[in-house]
Regions:
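Short, Lys/Arg-enriched N-terminal segments with co-localized hydrophobic residues
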Residues: 10-23
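Active-site acidic/histidine proton-transfer and metal-coordination neighborhood
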Residues: 40, 77-78, 82-86, 100-203
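Conserved, mostly hydrophobic/aromatic
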Residues: 45, 53, 83, 110, ...
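Glycine-rich, proline-tolerant flexible connector loops at the mouths of alpha/beta enzymes
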Residues: 56-78, 133-139
């Protein structure tokens, strides 16, 4: 599939596609939009037809240096006001740090950052605080030990108090399984959910993140399995695509690679009406075309 070969249809500027009463709420990562100050960035997201955004403060804000000390109620309320004025939901507040960092001092700093994001989210009114699932090294890189039972238990043990903290603020934490990280399969994600057993822990499902060169031929099975085992816990769907480059997968815009988007969107349409679907790995030049590809295909499946 390729967005350049798709016959684009005209849709409402709100960034949603209405079909039979169901709505897919499409968003974008704020740092994939051309940089602008917040009071221009969020209106620009709306003008491009997106209904929600995934925002990582350190990647999207350059007017000042975001940090725990800047995450005040006032900043949260300012962003919330801008979003309300422009009809843009905050689907995900990103806090993509390594909860299994083996350095005790760095781990302590990471925990404080998670707590700050949870407090911030409670005022901002976002869908979830999103995170990936870490690695057993300080560099946050792949090594086989990431997939060990010991690594999984480390992640569960370190995530549990974060989720407990989120419960106190009425905030949902959502983990995003990634093949190179500790939670690298649908089954391991289910184990984490069952072990922590909290309604404040849910899933960001990104099918491309669960693929590597050794299992791309099983992508349909993985998508189906995710909607079987994780169905009630999927809060957000990340939408990107992939191409194979050597022994690695390169992430690219949805509809321009090898992912089975008819299957994914059919599942979303059947089981997850109104779910936030945020695009990833777009660039300003193809973001709108990618949204239109998603909307047209969604109307057809």
């Amino acid at each position: 599939m390729n967005v350049h070969n798709v016959q684009i249809c005209s849709v409402a500027y709100t960034g949603v596609y209405r079909n039979g009463g169901y709505i897919m709420r499409i968003g974008i990562r704020a740092h994939d939009v051309a940089y602008a100050p917040l009071d221009e960035l969020i209106p620009n997201i709306h003008k491009q037809g997106f209904h929600c955004m995934h925002i990582a403060l350190t990647k999207s804000i350059k007017e000042f240096k975001p940090g725990v000390e800047t995450m005040t109620p006032g900043l949260a309320m300012y962003i919330k006001e801008l979003c309300a004025e422009n009809k843009v939901d905050v689907a995900v507040l990103g806090c993509y740090l390594n909860l299994c960092n083996p350095n005790p001092e760095k781990h302590k700093e990471i925990v404080e950052k998670y707590k700050a994001h949870i407090r911030f989210a409670s005022i901002l009114g976002c869908g979830v605080v999103g995170t990936e699932t870490g690695a057993v090294n300080e560099e946050y890189k792949y090594e086989p030990a990431n997939h060990s039972d010991e690594a999984l238990q480390c992640f569960i043990d370190n995530l549990r108090p974060i989720v407990k903290y989120a419960e106190q603020f009425g905030v949902i934490v959502a983990i995003e399984p990634v093949w190179k990280h500790i939670v690298n399969t649908v089954e391991r994600a289910r184990k984490v959910l069952d072990a922590i057993d909290s309604p404040n822990l849910q899933i960001i499902f990104d099918p491309v993140n669960l693929l590597y060169v050794g299992n791309i031929d099983k992508q349909d099975e993985i998508i189906n399995q995710a909607f079987d085992l994780l169905l009630k816990d999927i809060a957000v769907v990340h939408c990107k695509d992939y191409v194979v480059e050597g022994d690695e997968l390169k992430s690219i815009a949805a509809g321009t690679g090898g992912l089975n988007y008819p299957l994914l969107l059919k599942k979303i349409k059947e089981y997850k009406p109104y779910v936030h679907c945020t695009l990833e790995n777009t660039v300003p030049e193809n973001a709108v075309a990618t949204r239109e590809f998603m909307e047209k295909l969604y109307s057809e499946v």
